[in-house]
């Protein structure tokens, strides 16, 4: 048999590999190669380029392996779920999904830090669908998702429906405002996934006496907002009813202390997942800090927007384009567009403008005031704060995301869940009281290799917080123009003042607007009152930074022009600024009474003059000790504060705390404790900067307590009060009972009515047990609902029939006859071996009575005489 020729097929890159394939495995040496292809062989350079591009994913040109990017296919998901993910449009998992999904699939409890828009909903929905797989006939839900608002719950339900399209999982939505009877029917329908708000779900749990022992997968979505809205008691009660072998997930934008305590109590050895990009300052971010006075903050904000950022006034280009499109659509008869044009329009609308700026304010009163002021100045502005209505909040954020507005004025509480993909600038109108809050604010810009700027307004009272931030970042402090041109805005903390001419014009414009607009002036008054409360409730700066800030503020460089305006300000302007600064800080050595007496030569009011001199001498004597202490501090403020190591901070803070008490110092010197062997109950290498801050470097978080300590951050409430997580002791007057009652009753929905203790010991409203579920069961003629973990009804064949008689016309008549006889015997043996039961011979009293009546009738009939013919 002749040997066949080798395969004529060539490789993908027209490279013949038959020789390599059949070199050692050929049957004979007489095998003839196939004819060459008519196409000419390509050049070697082209072959090398194709091979390099084919192998680029596995290795680079230097030979070192390249880490492959993990996709959804590498996570071990089912085929139906992968199809649903592809249908949804997810091609590559987001960073939070890539880090969270594998941990969840390993049945570990997770605390994830993610903002709204980062893909966190799919991060917990995809593993939930993969774990539940299909509908279970056993009674009881297996998945529970708790959301803070109705809108977020609807969004989660939509994602669950879309990703679970290839399964038969049943999901229900239980939120406030819907009919309780309809929700009773939903729960009675044995759903697999429950998406609810805490208040309504707790109401249904108490009303229906639900058994939550079947829950295996629990998600607390936007947990920080859940605690802020006063759902702590409801969450504790719900958590008490869940089984111990559940898997709990907690997603939040920030980690307040109360949330960390809740996670420690409700989660079992959780894993903290947070992105390094959310805890670092980008190296592409440039920072500028401007020293201003309290009365100049509005003018400084307007000057930064006009002169530094070059923010255009009037409607944005996107809003004008949309108005033109709407006008053209009305004129056109055919309003349908091509698919490509629609996608192009959507893509352009979903990107903010190049001037997009976020302005952070302290309270919601500041947000309202700045919104009105900036709108008066002609800017396109959006605003968001914590207590804003959810629909209005969504509209305002969407306008900023799509480029309808250029400026977004927010508070820290409201901005923690907002994710803006492209952001150019961040302005800190009110300087943050913690370094972590500053990192959280400015982390929204300079992403994905883009450049970004942050501008901060620093008053004299904010200088200690600025020094805390400088110590936390470990960067050099540059005050004014003391270093000349050698300034790096991305690596240094550069401070200085704004040019006086432009700032004065902006301040004059603000003063004029406040005089003309009474509503704006009233808003400023309210904001000032809110600021007083905010100042009392914000965290205090470190004592060492407060001490150093006095020297920094009193220096001449503090009021000098910022190096950012070096090209715009000449030397003459710099001298003018110095002269104005000296005039502004001038204090006369004598009062007007002393000057007049010296000029006129009179000696009136001698007692008053002596009192003034005595007070002045007393103040000067008190200033001398402080000046002596300041002499011990080196003159180079920036050099002294630029690179402070941990050992320096330890020595500085420990010596400062010990110098207050000389007796304690003597006692420690004469103490019997040997420092070489004595172990203190407190760590001796902690510094205040480390306690208030967290390590921004990446690392493994093996212990949740340690990891959460580095990520914990409490935000002050945007209404001027304390942040969530602290007990409110406010009372209100109850008109009906004529007494003061706790306002906590209003938050849990009881409105001052009676509270009862739940299963966990927490107080819940007594109105949750109203009896409506019992009435619903009576209306629908339902008895007791099936117990949890009991399977549903399954059909089983229990009917018994007599065997058919064998057909004598069939060929297997004898065989079928024997089968019928055997079936009869089995039926008789199953009945106890006796023959089929006949009519019982024992008569009852009724049978006997009836029989007697019938017999008597027969007798009477038979005893009648016969008829005569």
From Swiss-Prot:
Helicase ATP-binding domain ranges (all copies): 101-273
GO biological process, any: rRNA processing
Cellular compartment(s): Nucleus, Nucleolus
Short sequence motif named DEAD box, residue ranges: 221-224
Phylogenetic lineage: Eukaryota, Fungi, Dikarya, Ascomycota, Pezizomycotina
Region described as Disordered: 1-43, 315-348, 792-869
Protein name (database record): ATP-dependent RNA helicase dbp10
Polar residues composition-biased segments: 21-35
Motif (Q motif): 70-98
Composition bias type Basic residues, residue spans: 851-869
EC id: 3.6.4.13
Role of this protein: ATP-binding RNA helicase involved in the biogenesis of 60S ribosomal subunits and is required for the normal formation of 25S and 5.8S rRNAs.
Comment on protein domains: The Q motif is unique to and characteristic of the DEAD box family of RNA helicases and controls ATP binding and hydrolysis.
Binding-site list for ATP: 114-121
Compositional bias (Basic and acidic residues): 800-828, 838-850
Keywords: ATP-binding, Helicase, Hydrolase, Nucleotide-binding, Nucleus, Ribosome biogenesis, RNA-binding, rRNA processing
Family as reported in the entry's similarity comment: Belongs to the DEAD box helicase family. DDX54/DBP10 subfamily.
PANTHER family: ATP-DEPENDENT RNA HELICASE RHLE-RELATED, RNA HELICASE
Annotated signal peptide: none
Top-level EC class as recorded in UniProt: hydrolase
Reaction(s) catalysed by this chain's protein: ATP + H2O = ADP + phosphate + H(+)
The keyword Amino-acid biosynthesis belongs to this UniProt entry's keyword annotation: no
SUPFAM superfamilies the record matches: P-loop containing nucleoside triphosphate hydrolases (SSF52540)
């Amino acid at each position: 048999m002749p040997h066949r020729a080798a395969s004529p097929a060539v490789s993908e890159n027209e490279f013949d590999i038959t020789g390599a394939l059949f070199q050692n495995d050929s049957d004979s040496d007489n095998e003839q190669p196939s004819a060459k292809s008519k196409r000419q062989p390509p050049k070697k350079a082209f072959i090398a380029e194709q091979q390099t591009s084919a192998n680029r994913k596995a290795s680079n040109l230097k030979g070192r392996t390249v880490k492959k990017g993990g996709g959804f296919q590498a996570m071990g998901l089912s085929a139906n779920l992968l199809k649903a993910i592809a249908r949804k449009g997810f091609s590559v998992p987001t960073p939070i999904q890539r880090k969270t999904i594998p941990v969840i699939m390993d049945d570990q409890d997770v605390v994830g830090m993610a903002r709204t828009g980062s893909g966190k909903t799919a991060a917990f929905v995809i593993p939930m669908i993969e774990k539940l797989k299909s509908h279970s006939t056993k009674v009881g839900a297996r998945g529970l998702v708790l959301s803070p608002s109705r809108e977020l719950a609807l969004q989660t339900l939509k994602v669950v429906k879309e990703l679970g399209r290839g399964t038969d999982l049943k999901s229900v939505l239980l939120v406030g405002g819907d009919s309780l009877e309809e929700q009773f029917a939903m729960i009675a329908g044995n759903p697999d996934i429950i998406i609810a708000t805490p208040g309504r779900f707790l109401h249904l749990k108490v009303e229906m006496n639900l058994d939550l022992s079947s829950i295996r997968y629990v998600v607390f979505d936007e947990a920080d907002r859940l605690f802020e809205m006063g759902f702590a008691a409801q969450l504790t009660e719900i958590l008490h009813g869940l089984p111990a072998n559940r898997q709990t997930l907690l997603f939040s934008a920030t980690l307040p202390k109360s949330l960390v305590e809740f996670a420690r109590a409700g989660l079992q050895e959780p894993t903290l997942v947070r992105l390094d990009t959310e805890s670092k300052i980008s190296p592409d971010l440039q920072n500028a800090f401007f020293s201003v006075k309290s009365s100049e903050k509005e003018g400084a904000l307007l000057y930064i927007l006009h002169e530094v950022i070059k923010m255009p006034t009037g409607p944005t280009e996107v809003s004008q384009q949309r108005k033109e499109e709407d006008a053209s659509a009305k004129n056109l008869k055919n309003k349908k567009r091509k698919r490509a044009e629609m996608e192009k329009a959507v893509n352009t609308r979903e990107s903010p403008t190049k001037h997009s700026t976020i302005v952070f304010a302290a309270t919601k009163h500041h947000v309202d005031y700045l919104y009105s002021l900036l709108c008066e100045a002609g800017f396109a502005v959006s605003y968001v704060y914590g207590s804003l209505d959810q629909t209005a909040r969504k509209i305002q954020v969407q306008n900023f995301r799509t480029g309808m507005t250029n400026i977004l004025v927010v508070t820290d509480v409201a901005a923690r869940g907002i994710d803006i993909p492209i952001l150019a600038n961040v302005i800190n109108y009110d300087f943050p009281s913690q370094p972590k809050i500053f990192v959280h604010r400015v982390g929204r810009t300079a992403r994905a290799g883009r450049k970004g700027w942050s501008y901060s307004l620093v008053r004299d009272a904010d200088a200690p917080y600025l020094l805390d931030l400088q110590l936390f970042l470990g960067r050099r402090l540059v005050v004014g123009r003391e270093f000349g041109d050698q300034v790096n805005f991305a690596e240094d903390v550069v401070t200085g003042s704004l040019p006086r001419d432009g700032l004065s014009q902006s301040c004059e414009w603000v003063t004029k607007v406040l005089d003309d607009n009474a509503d704006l002036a009233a808003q400023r008054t309210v904001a000032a009152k809110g600021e007083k409360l905010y100042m009392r409730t914000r965290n205090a700066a470190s004592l060492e930074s407060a001490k150093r800030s006095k020297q920094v503020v009193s220096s001449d460089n503090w009021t000098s022009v910022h190096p950012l305006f070096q090209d715009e300000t000449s030397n003459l302007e710099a001298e003018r600024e110095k002269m104005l600064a000296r005039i502004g800080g001038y204090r006369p050595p004598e009062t007007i009474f002393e000057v007049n007496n010296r000029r006129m030569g009179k000696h009136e009011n001698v007692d008053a003059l002596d009192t003034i001199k005595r007070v002045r001498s007393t103040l000067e004597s008190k200033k001398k000790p402080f000046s002596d202490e300041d002499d011990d501090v080196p003159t180079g403020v920036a050099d002294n504060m630029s690179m402070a190591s941990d050992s320096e901070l330890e020595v500085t803070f420990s010596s400062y705390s010990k110098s207050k008490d000389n007796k304690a110092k003597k006692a420690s010197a004469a103490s019997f404790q040997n420092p070489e062997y004595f172990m203190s109950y407190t760590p001796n290498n902690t510094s205040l900067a480390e306690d208030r801050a967290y390590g921004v470097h990446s690392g493994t978080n093996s212990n949740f307590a340690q990891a959460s300590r580095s990520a914990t951050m409490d935000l002050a409430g945007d209404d001027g009060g304390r942040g969530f997580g602290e007990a409110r002791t406010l009372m209100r007057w109850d008109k009906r009972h004529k007494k003061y009652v706790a306002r906590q009753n209003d938050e849990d929905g009881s409105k001052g009515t009676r509270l009862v203790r739940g299963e966990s010991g927490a107080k819940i409203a007594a109105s949750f047990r109203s009896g409506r579920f019992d009435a619903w069961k009576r209306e629908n003629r339902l008895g007791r609902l099936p117990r949890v973990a009991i399977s549903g009804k399954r059909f089983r064949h229990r009917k018994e029939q007599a065997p058919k008689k064998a057909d004598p016309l069939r060929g297997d008549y004898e065989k079928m006859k024997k089968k019928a006889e055997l079936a009869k015997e089995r039926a008789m043996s199953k009945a106890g071996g006796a023959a089929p039961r006949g009519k019982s011979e024992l008569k009852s009293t009724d049978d006997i009575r009836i029989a007697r009546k019938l017999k008597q009738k027969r007798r009477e009939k038979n005893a009648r005489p016969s008829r005569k013919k």
